[in-house]
Amino acid sequence: MILMWPHFSPVLFSIGPFSIHYYALAYITALLIGWRLVRHTASMTPVAATGEQVDDFLTWATLGIILGGRLGYVIFYQPLFFATHPLRIIAVWDGGMSFHGGFLGVTIAIIWFCVKNHIHPLRFADRIAVAVPMGLFLGRCANFINGELWGRPAAPWFPLPMIYPQSGSMVPRYPSELIEASLEGIVLFIVMLIAVRFEKLRFCSGALTGIFVAGYGIARITGEFFREPDWFLGFLPFGTTMGQILSIPMILAGIGLILWGAKHKSA
């Protein structure tokens, strides 16, 4: 069965000149759900942070995601364009955010916040890592609603290919946004929910973060095989994509964090 991408308006609603886009709603919802979830996981033994500290970190996380995500996109994906159009860097409403940049932004925010508040950074990061896949799921759903980041032409065996008219052709494609939402969001979220329930893992500071980081890298590399590469980059050497290249270090870093946590188990 071949499906047609259902045309959505990217705007949820408008009041005069003020508009709320689905993409903004995804970010807001992800932050609120993540905040409540981290409040719960941070209180699990060993306690990573107080509820008030989690509340305070919400602002830091928001800045890390937005600034890191935007600058990551500028640096990793279109540095030459933004070098000649620097004022467009602030035009986040035009789209263009990088998870890898957002990840680095939040990492810096965690370290800075934890040093400032005398919190164990890896233990705090472990509890935050549990909530991140839900945000990834919502972000990919927003990508689908916006009709962006569509997939490569689908193989004959794929049961539900989709036609994206905005791609410029009527070729059936993989609904890659939904595939990535399933891998990076649902599957990884289930893995993290199971992992955080093991007290031994919670005492291995950095292990939960490592599971998330490595798990995301694997999910992203897998999902990229279904996704059409960005038109301004195309395929990189050996048929890879920028998303895959940036995810390889994440797998290595994740494995390193798991080993570190196992070796330096906290009391």
Q: Where do the protein language model's features map onto the residues?
A:
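A feature for loop-to-transmembrane-helix boundaries and adjacent hydrophobic helices
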Residues: 1-267
